[in-house]
């Protein structure tokens, strides 16, 4: 109910949440909350799922949309390190490799990939 109210108050054009088949429980819960609010809200917006660590944490992720993050990659790395409880030093190399791979898929140096949720009637 809180997520739905937030969406209806803020009226976003787009929301990015975690991929629902993620090995991290908190990520799965977040994804379900956002998806349910998206379905229940009377407000229309695009819903995208992002990946955390494909193959290790984000399972069965098949992108439908890519973004060139070459110009903002360094800022993204800085933002990672603000999440101090997660020990980003240990995963930064993996994230760089994933972003290089996604960049190759969209013909850039660094990229991010997403899956766009398609509306399906119940």
Which role fits each region the language model picked out?
Residues 1-122:
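Metal-dependent de-N-acetylase/amidase catalytic core
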């Amino acid at each position: 109910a809180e997520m739905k109210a937030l969406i209806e108050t803020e009226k976003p054009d787009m929301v990015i949440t975690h991929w629902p088949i993620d090995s991290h429980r908190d990520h799965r819960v977040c994804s379900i909350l956002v998806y349910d609010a998206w379905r229940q809200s009377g407000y229309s917006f695009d819903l995208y799922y992002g990946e955390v660590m494909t193959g290790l944490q984000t399972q069965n992720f098949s992108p439908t949309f890519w973004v060139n993050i070459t110009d903002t990659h360094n800022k993204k790395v800085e933002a990672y390190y603000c999440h101090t409880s997660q020990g980003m030093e240990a995963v930064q190399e993996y994230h760089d490799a994933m972003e290089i791979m996604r960049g190759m898929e969209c013909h850039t140096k660094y990229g991010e990939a997403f899956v766009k949720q398609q509306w399906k009637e119940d």
